């Protein structure tokens, strides 16, 4: 049975949905136990005088009655409940908040837009990799937060009065998806962005991170359609045209777009296009967390690590009792191989990091069983929470682990969208070779070998007489030559006297 003192809960009463996150603290990290989301559309219940309707408030209270059961075994001081844009502006918010606090047995805090932006940034900083300057964009139901910062430190916090629910009611109220409706929605968003745009552009950023349901929906669409994970303006424009072709909200069908997200997708899309155009954003990635994660990490008082991925890898290695020395051995060899072929094979630093991550986790499948360990490894990584990695990167690493040895299955490599397929193929080849050469699990048995490429042909130069002195690994290498040939990956061995041996 879980000790109640290890449980934490964060509840976000948003303008579109109410969310609850329940986690357990484990050795300085969090394990997600439950995520509950209910579409309440509170903002849709605001009238022209900014008063919430009784029906909208009842929808919210009913949702909180459901949430309250989860909270009974969690200490009150380990629960944070916040309300955002709609309850900031509703004239009768006090009525809703009083009853909501009573239902939950915990105070509901209506937070300012700036505080919301700060919490969103904290959630992103704790869960999304990279030490670069960031621009974080979160399109909510009633407001949009824009935050710049580096590491744990924010430099600008902005909360703007536009959201996917309010824009739905204002610019798509007839439920028509027309050029005119989109143009009006985008123009209105640009007008709100105009006073802050220059300041944000001058501040600058190296990576743009999206932390909202709209961005999550875009990721799901791109995955379903086999696109890479980077969100760009041309992709947004293509999706807008597809929406316009559907004509009506009720008839909106885009591959990968769920029914649940469809209603507010066009309005969120219009706001996002306006943000891209106004701020000249080249591309955007999906955040690993936002407001609720910011609340949880705030209660835990955990420092923000610069290298979130390393923390994630350490935690998983510890949890699954992975042989860290062997993982490091394979990492070192793979790094050695990577350096030698990266230029000719056009492999960048992003490739290097993902290859290293796969090396760190390659033996995770042994925690289930030796037989079919690569399949077990792939399954585990596909379903584990990996802070610092995007969903596409997680799928890529899983595809690497599936193909770390044995017969090569190209399907998962072809289906991932984190890297170009040729780069994924090349990294798998390096991983497989590093595992073979490190198979004796001793540092003093690693050969001083060289790799070079001729287009897709990979040539390994071994020390003189190495093959004769290491018959088991030599046999594994000859088998590997055969396995790679089945998928048209030429692999050749030679010894330093230039004699070709395979």
Swiss-Prot record:
Pfam families for the chain: Ppx-GppA, Ppx-GppA_III
InterPro entries named in the record: ATPase_NBD (IPR043129), GppA/Ppx_hydrolase (IPR050273), Guo-5TP_3DP_PyrP (IPR023709), Ppx_GppA_C (IPR048950), Ppx_GppA_N (IPR003695), PyroPPase_GppA_Ppx (IPR030673)
EC number(s) given by UniProt: 3.6.1.40
Entry GO MF terms: guanosine-5'-triphosphate,3'-diphosphate diphosphatase activity
Catalytic reactions of this protein: guanosine 3'-diphosphate 5'-triphosphate + H2O = guanosine 3',5'-bis(diphosphate) + phosphate + H(+)
Gene3D superfamilies, alphabetized: 3.30.420.40, Exopolyphosphatase. Domain 2, Hypothetical protein af1432
Keywords: Hydrolase
Pathway membership: Purine metabolism; ppGpp biosynthesis; ppGpp from GTP: step 2/2
Function, in words: Catalyzes the conversion of pppGpp to ppGpp. Guanosine pentaphosphate (pppGpp) is a cytoplasmic signaling molecule which together with ppGpp controls the 'stringent response', an adaptive process that allows bacteria to respond to amino acid starvation, resulting in the coordinated regulation of numerous cellular activities.
PANTHER family: EXOPOLYPHOSPHATASE, RETROGRADE REGULATION PROTEIN 2
Protein name, UniProt field: Guanosine-5'-triphosphate,3'-diphosphate pyrophosphatase
Gene: gppA
């Amino acid at each position: 049975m879980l000790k109640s003192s290890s449980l934490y809960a964060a509840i976000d009463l948003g303008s579109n949905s109410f969310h609850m996150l329940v986690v357990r603290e484990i050795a300085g990290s969090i394990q997600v136990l439950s995520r509950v989301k209910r579409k309440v559309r509170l903002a849709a219940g605001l009238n022209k005088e900014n008063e919430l309707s009784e029906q909208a408030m009842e929808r919210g209270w009913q949702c909180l009655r459901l949430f309250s059961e989860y909270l009974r075994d969690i200490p009150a001081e380990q629960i944070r409940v916040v309300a955002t844009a709609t309850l900031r502006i509703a004239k009768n918010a006090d009525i809703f908040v009083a009853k909501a606090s009573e239902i939950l047995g915990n105070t509901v805090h209506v937070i300012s837009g700036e505080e919301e932006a700060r919490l969103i940034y904290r959630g992103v900083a704790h869960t999304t990799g990279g030490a670069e300057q960031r621009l974080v964009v979160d399109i909510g139901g009633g407001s949009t937060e824009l935050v710049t910062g580096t590491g744990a430190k924010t430099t600008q916090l902005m909360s703007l009065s536009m959201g996917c629910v309010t824009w739905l009611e204002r610019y798509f109220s007839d439920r028509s998806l027309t050029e005119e409706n989109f143009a009006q929605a985008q123009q209105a968003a640009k007008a709100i962005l105009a006073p802050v745009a220059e300041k944000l552009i001058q501040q600058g950023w190296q990576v743009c991170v999206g932390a909202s349901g709209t961005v999550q929906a875009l990721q799901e669409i791109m995955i379903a359609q086999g696109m890479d994970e980077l969100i760009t303006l041309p992709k947004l424009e293509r999706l807008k045209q597809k929406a316009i072709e559907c004509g009506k909200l009720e008839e909106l069908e885009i591959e990968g777009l769920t029914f649940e997200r469809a209603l507010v997708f066009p309005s969120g899309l219009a706001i996002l296009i306006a943000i891209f155009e106004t701020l000249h954003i080249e591309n955007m990635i999906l955040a690993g967390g936002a407001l609720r994660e910011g609340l949880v990490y705030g209660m835990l008082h955990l420092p923000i690590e610069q290298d979130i991925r390393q923390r994630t890898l350490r935690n998983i290695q510890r949890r699954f009792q992975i042989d860290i020395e062997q993982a490091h051995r394979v990492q070192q060899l793979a790094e050695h191989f990577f350096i030698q072929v990266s230029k000719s094979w056009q492999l960048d630093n992003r490739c290097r990091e993902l290859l290293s991550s796969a090396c760190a986790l390659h033996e995770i499948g042994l925690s289930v069983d030796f037989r079919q360990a690569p399949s077990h490894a792939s399954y585990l990584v596909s379903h584990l929470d990996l802070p610092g990695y995007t969903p596409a990167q997680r799928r890529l690493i899983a595809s690497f682990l599936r193909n770390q040895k044995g017969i090569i299955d190209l399907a998962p490599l072809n289906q991932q969208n984190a890297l170009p397929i040729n780069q994924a193929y090349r990294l798998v080849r390096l991983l497989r070779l590093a595992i073979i050469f490190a198979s004796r699990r001793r540092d003093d048995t690693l050969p001083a070998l060289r790799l070079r490429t001729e287009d897709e042909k990979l040539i390994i130069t071994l020390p003189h007489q190495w093959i004769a002195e290491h018959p088991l690994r030599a046999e594994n290498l000859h088998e590997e030559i055969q396995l790679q040939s089945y998928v048209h990956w030429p692999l050749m061995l030679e010894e330093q006297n230039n004699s070709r041996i395979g």
